[in-house]
Swiss-Prot record:
Keywords, ordered alphabetically: Acetylation, Calvin cycle, Carbon dioxide fixation, Chloroplast, Disulfide bond, Lyase, Magnesium, Metal-binding, Methylation, Monooxygenase, Oxidoreductase, Photorespiration, Photosynthesis, Plastid
Chief place where the protein resides: plastid
Chain positions of site Transition state stabilizer: K334
Lineage, top ranks: Eukaryota, Viridiplantae, Streptophyta, Embryophyta, Tracheophyta
Full protein name: Ribulose bisphosphate carboxylase large chain
Compartments, as annotated in UniProt: Plastid, Chloroplast
Superkingdom assignment: Eukaryota
EC number from the UniProt entry: 4.1.1.39
Species of provenance: Viscum album (European mistletoe)
The protein's assembly and partners: Heterohexadecamer of 8 large chains and 8 small chains; disulfide-linked. The disulfide link is formed within the large subunit homodimers.
Record: residues binding Mg(2+): K201, D203, E204
Length: 475
């Protein structure tokens, strides 16, 4: 017998394959305050019991593999393994269930969303024993969330920087999103800002293309910002998209934006990646830049109800990685978003303490222990008739962005911006006077349009525009 064989025998090694549930299904386990908790929607293959499928998820997303290995004896699996501690049925779905998994904190690198996701939503999603798998929710314990810087500034600091209080912020994505020269792009920015918007925005796929290189765009947009500020007396900003092919190039663009003195930059955090995003968020805090986050690619991950990852998880990840704004759907516009579920993850972005509420898709109570909040951005197919609903749904701590709803105005960009600003101010005033925005919204807009020809023209253009499709994302 070789020394190696003796070593295996000495640690009690028994080769072979055994059911995951024998090690990783622990229904009597009491979760710890320091555990990271996950709720998975599991659709196993026919013949795979729920306990085995849930245990397989816990194993393959933590310490397990498909067979027993002799090195198991060199560590304490009981200390490091993930545990499937509860299984519950999904109402109306005979083939699905929710598996709750607890992960010891030591499994994850501090301050790294990249490492967190590499385990929890890594290879486990490719298991043949599962037909589909979706991560519905995460509980991030204070012991882990405190290892993250989080948003560069947060909601209150942003309001103080901008000197804007008591209402949602107004934005606009410049259209057409691709094809404008830098000078014409800057002109469009200026017209929108002078008309009354707080922000304009690069679209998510505006980086540095042949028709408009990033440096030229940054310079012309900065000129537009300063000119609009001088004329209006208000602080203005444009989300300069710093997303690039390399982290080094991204940082170079952020540095140039800071040198221009602009207040905010932007990043596509899913296509750009969490490592790049966290690096940029740290730079923004250190250098006084706000950070706007676009979620391009999210629907590839979160749109399917039985596989992938819900956006509420991506929203939590962004709050840890860092961003001052993030797109969050509109409920009433052209993009997917059911009201209660949307407000559930909006609360996870903004609030400090969020109670478990399954009716809104919140699987776990979340205590952020003073991690700065993120402003949700409503953007996509919205116009002046939506303003009462948006104000009522999202409240003051939000950004309402009207791209086509500004640049599509028949009189041009500046009148489009005026129409949106007048509509917003009318809705905020009506709300503050105690009026019901949900019930009286159209009347409030019609009353305001009597005093604003720009708003009246916008009301006429979009009076029949609706996006009435059933939401895919339901409980």
């Amino acid at each position: 017998m070789s020394p190696q064989t003796e070593t295996k025998a000495s640690v009690g090694f028994k080769a072979g394959v055994k059911d995951y549930k024998l090690t990783y299904y622990t229904p009597d386990y009491e979760t710890k305050d320091t555990d990271i908790l996950a709720a998975f929607r599991v659709t196993p293959q026919p013949g795979v019991p729920p306990e085995e499928a849930g245990a397989a998820v816990a194993a393959e997303s933590s310490t397990g593999t498909w067979t027993t290995v002799w090195t198991d004896g060199l560590t304490s699996l009981d200390r490091y393994k993930g545990r499937c501690y509860h299984i519950e049925p999904v109402a109306g779905e005979q083939t699905q269930f929710i598996a709750y998994v607890a992960y010891p904190l030591d499994l994850f690198e501090e301050g790294s969303v990249t490492n967190l996701f590499t385990s929890i939503v890594g290879n486990v999603f490719g298991l043949k024993a599962l037909r589909a798998l979706r991560l519905e929710g995460l509980r991030i314990p204070p012991a882990y969330s405190k290892t993250f810087q989080g948003p560069p500034h947060g909601i209150q600091v942003e309001r103080d920087k901008l000197n804007k209080y008591g209402r949602p912020l107004l934005g606009c994505t410049i259209k057409p999103k691709l094809g404008l020269s830098a000078k014409n792009y800057g002109r469009a920015v200026y017209e929108c800002l002078r008309g009354g918007l707080d922000f304009t925005k690069d679209d998510e796929n505006v980086n540095s293309q042949p028709f408009m290189r990033w440096r030229d765009r940054f310079v012309f947009c900065a000129e537009a910002i300063y000119k609009a500020q001088a004329e209006t007396g208000e602080i203005k900003g444009h989300y300069l998209n710093a997303t690039a092919g390399t982290c080094e190039e991204m940082m170079k663009r952020a540095v140039f934006a800071r040198e221009l003195g602009v207040p905010i930059v932007m990043h596509d955090y899913l296509t750009g990646g969490f490592t790049a995003n966290t690096s940029l968020a740290h730079y923004c805090r250190d250098n006084g830049l706000l950070l706007h986050i676009h979620r391009a690619m999210h629907a590839v991950i979160d749109r399917q109800k039985n596989h992938g990852m819900h956006f509420r998880v991506l929203a939590k990840a962004l709050r840890m990685s860092g961003g001052d704004h993030i797109h969050a759907g509109t409920v009433v516009g052209k993009l997917e978003g059911e009201r209660d579920i949307t407000l559930g993850f909006v609360d996870l972005l903004r609030d400090d303490f969020i109670e478990k509420d399954r009716s809104r898709g919140i699987y776990f109570t979340q205590d952020w222990v003073s991690l700065p909040g993120v402003l949700p951005v409503a953007s996509g197919g919205i116009h002046v008739w939506h303003m009462p609903a948006l104000t009522e749904i999202f409240g003051d701590d939000s950004v309402l962005q009207f791209g086509g709803g500004t640049l599509g105005h028949p009189w041009g960009n500046a009148p489009g911006a005026v129409a949106n600003r007048v509509a917003l101010e009318a809705c905020v005033q009506a709300r503050n006077e105690g009026r019901d925005l949900a019930r009286e919204g159209n009347e409030i807009i019609r009353e305001a349009s009597k005093w604003s020809p720009e708003l009246a023209a916008a009301c006429e253009v979009w009076k029949a525009i609706k996006f009435e499709f059933a939401a895919v994302d339901t409980l």
